[in-house]
């Protein structure tokens, strides 16, 4: 009978490797080792006066010393004790035939049972079981769970299965495809503007139920995190941290390709996909600008056409986005759901309400480093700083006039869209001057 090395059925770590394991990996190692000992006992090893629990206090030393006391040590092969040295040891049929069907693709270890390999694979930090290329001898159910390789019951040959995900639901407007009808319906609402979830407290509706539930917490007062800079209440700690960074200016996530920094990992991923990964194949016919997806192109084209999609049923005024329409409708209903508990003044919008609260507290945490003037809002400070720098980054593409803020530019562009012959604030015949 061929000898089988002890490492073939036991996971062994050196003292240096053991020190690098996390507590969860050490607990996993403990469980695997315990099962290994039990399996050894089941094939004929008699464990006398052995306290298994004490064994795990120092696994690296106790494991070797225990085997050495049972088997002795072969000269010149310090850690390759074999089953042939263990008295009354009878290997099972798999080991007698030499079949070792379970092999780890990471470190090369082989195991007699797939359960040993399954647990061993988890010990590899960051190794996903679905990526395992090892040889598995499993039931059909577990072959399906493994998802990478399956064994034919007739021939025993392994065949590779490449899973494919079909997306049968395709949007006719932008071409985006989905594999779920629910996600497809939610996406369609972004084009139609349909909002099925309506708030009973105020005139506001939502396309997605999760957004509706989050909004409901605003009325119940279920807000756990409040920003010390602006007083805005936020539901979740992750969103709260991102919001605080908008005040502090911290941008810990940096793009490795262009060096641009972002306040969250999600913004960084979006930037990497749109700016570096995707080919910008959608080109605007008006200005020639290229964008990565058709939906971005549709949004961009509205800036040229002045297209407004959402119309007020009472005054026929139209808006580009549904939230602007909902805010406008409050002017007709007279609804002012936000009330100050100090002076009783009411407001239409939560942003105006938060800004008003600072008039009572006198809080102005944003101070200009040049003149010392303080502001209650970070945006107000940024606007003020431009008066020192003279920065005017927004310029009109048609007449060349430059502006300090984008909203000033948008107001100016309407004069061109309306067909006026002169620019905003400039009489006909005046020379063009780049300034506000």
From Swiss-Prot:
Q: Which gene encodes it?
A: ZNF101
Annotated localization = Nucleus
Would you kindly state one Gene Ontology biological process term found in this protein's UniProt entry? Answer: regulation of transcription by RNA polymerase II
Q: What is this protein called?
A: Zinc finger protein 101
> One of this protein's Pfam families, by short name?
zf-C2H2
List the biased-composition ranges (Polar residues).
151-163
Region of interest: Disordered: 128-164
Q: Which UniProt keywords apply?
A: DNA-binding, Metal-binding, Nucleus, Repeat, Transcription, Transcription regulation, Zinc, Zinc-finger
What are the TM regions of this chain, as residue ranges? none
Species per Swiss-Prot/TrEMBL record: Homo sapiens
